[in-house]
């Protein structure tokens, strides 16, 4: 079972037929394969990861957020990573691609646009770091710093309770450290 990456994709194209094609492929769950087709009839892990940037195709009818003649906005989950390699191919086909992504299990997020992939490793960040270092659009879209702050508070509560339970169980005197303590 993969870790799922949350994605939002905004596609624009001068040709309305390309937008319709993208919408229809997304609704079928064959979005990437429509524009970057797999060779042969068999699925190939290495080929998909190399040419799509992710293990499996994406899309379903539920994830279509909005569509106009020249724009399609969708959201979807992808296996392990965003389909950045597919985005590059879409740009070659005349699409303008703007995508955001967040993978909470592996602690990364990013924005992909015409300048490439702006990737953020969150693994050594706390909620304050995320608020300061991530673009606010990305943080707000996925609620990253808010989720991290909730986790930090829950974790602190668990550690505090664990300490209190241990002191009580062993009959020791509680030791209170100040915030300025180096101990």
Each language-model region and where it sits:
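Long, contiguous binding/interaction regions
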Residues: 1-183
